């Protein structure tokens, strides 16, 4: 994913608590007014796993979109005014990162009554780059995978004790 909040750096982990539904798939499952939120138990397991493994993490809302280049080159798009204005609104609302999967997963999971959560490796943060701040670019997803695997272990253990 790409960081949006200035505190989010490449190499950090983002745990999504909810997703802005700026994509089309989730609309096939539920009206746009229905929120795309992660399961609380899964979210807590992801956060506790990131902490236990010693990773820098950020939990919060992510922006979920269909178009990769709308984020990275919005001025080239016919709807640039809309993309730029919404991007600014999401930042002002404290959105942590931009990605392309969580909204549909959270909505489908709500419909199916199953637990779902998501964690991401932050590749970089274009906002930090534009501000001239340190912006490490990281492509190694091992940390996000380790967090997810540890979270599943914790969920299995909790389910056994329930």
PLM regions: where:
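Glycine-rich phosphate- or other oxyanion-binding loops that anchor nucleotides, phosphorylated ligands
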Residues: 1-162
């Amino acid at each position: 994913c790409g960081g949006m909040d200035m505190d989010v750096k490449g190499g950090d982990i983002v745990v999504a608590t909810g997703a802005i539904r700026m994509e089309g798939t989730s609309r096939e499952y539920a009206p746009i007014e229905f929120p795309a939120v992660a399961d609380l138990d899964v979210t807590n397991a992801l956060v506790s796993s990131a902490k236990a493994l010693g990773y820098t993490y950020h939990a919060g809302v992510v922006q979920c979109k269909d178009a990769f280049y709308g984020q990275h080159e919005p001025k080239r798009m016919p709807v640039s005014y809309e993309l730029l204005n919404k991007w600014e609104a999401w930042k002002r609302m404290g959105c942590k990162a931009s990605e392309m999967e969580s909204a549909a997963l959270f909505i489908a999971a709500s419909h199916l009554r199953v637990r779902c959560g998501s964690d991401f490796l932050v590749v970089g943060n274009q906002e930090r780059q534009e501000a001239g701040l340190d912006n490490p670019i990281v492509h190694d997803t091992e940390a996000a995978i380790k967090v997810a695997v540890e979270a599943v272990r914790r969920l299995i253990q909790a389910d056994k004790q329930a």
